[in-house]
Amino acid sequence: MQQKNIFLITIFSMLCVLNCIPAACRMKGETSMEQLRELMVKNQIEARGVSDTRVLEAMRSVERHKFVPGHHIASAYEDHPLPIGHGQTISQPYIVALMTELCELKGKEKVLEIGTGSGYQAAVLSLLAREVYSIEIVEPLAISASEKLAELGYTNVHIRVGDGYKGMPDKAPFDVIMLTASPPKIPQALIDQLGEGGILVAPEGDYSQELVKLTKQNGKITKRTITYVRFVPMIHGS
């Protein structure tokens, strides 16, 4: 009888261990991703001069690996953009952080993003602003980004399929507008939808592109060039 009890206890213990293995693996995997995210912030973002503590915390919080295709997950926290299909990319982490810092978000802003892509930039913005409206011209990307953001609990992001050159006039004015693809020239429609005191951050240009920051004060636009960049071109609607 005692041997039988020992045998049953042994079997039970083995089952417990086996049941714990997947959970342990998941925990190890998540911990590893968290460590990679921390290294990304420290070595790629802080080291290059991004210092806004809210932006840094948002970059630590958003799980970038959940916004890239499965075969690129291992590269999610590396220092370069990644393809997401349909000729589009998820931007380099540093560029995401830099552009977000340039927006000077305090938490009460209504933001317009042109080019949802994977939804990663929108997720970062959602932690720093009141509402984020995002336009994506590639419908499959808009659908997958909407599903991913909902799944991860980013409830203040609103995605629409449409032409980014036209903006979203029914939701204007916006405190901040961000473009994640490069037009040859910043569309006047977007400048018109920028509210008084607002900020627009975007790449601009064809082959040679510059990251620019526009501010609107007393109805006048001031433009500042930040650095040279390389983004996918901004696509016109049909």
Predicted ranges, named:
Residues 104-221:
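Conserved nucleotide-cofactor-binding alpha/beta core module
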Residues 25-112, 123-124, 128, 141-143, ...:
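Class I SAM-dependent transferase core
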Residues 1-11:
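Bacterial N-terminal signal peptides that target proteins for export
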Residues 9-19:
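Bacterial N-terminal signal peptides
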Residues 4-5, 94, 123, 136:
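Compositionally biased, intrinsically disordered low-complexity segments enriched
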